[in-house]
Amino acid sequence: MEQIIIQIISATIGSIGFALVFNVKRDKFRYVITGAFLGITTYFIVDYLTHSTFLSNVIASIVCTASAEFLARWRKAPATLFLIIHIIPLVPGGSLFYCMRSFVLKDQEAFKSYGLSTLYSAAGIAVGILVVTSFLSILYSYKRPEQR
């Protein structure tokens, strides 16, 4: 449990670094970091309950995308500003590194294992983003009766 808390804090600090690199303005800074914290915390909770990399990434990216879309409308800023920083902690950088390392060292078994882990993570993130953006697109495509 202690290791998970350290990973959550580290991921949040890493998101702060990316927020600084992307020049996120002060009035949006705390919202961007809070979303990243929520996303990685959701990931670890779902991973603890299900032990599924794919499902953990799907649900965490749904939380990240929904919060990014909400914040974009509330703070009147592009959703990608929030979404990129929210998703950063979910990106499977470690497994991608070890996948490529195994490939270079010609360790086929490790390459396959890390490669599948990377693909599951990336696909989970993509599916989560797709679900929320598609839902919101359909939702906002219908005009309210009084606006017709």
Predicted regions and their residues:
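Hydrophobic alpha-helical membrane segments
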Residues: I85-Y98
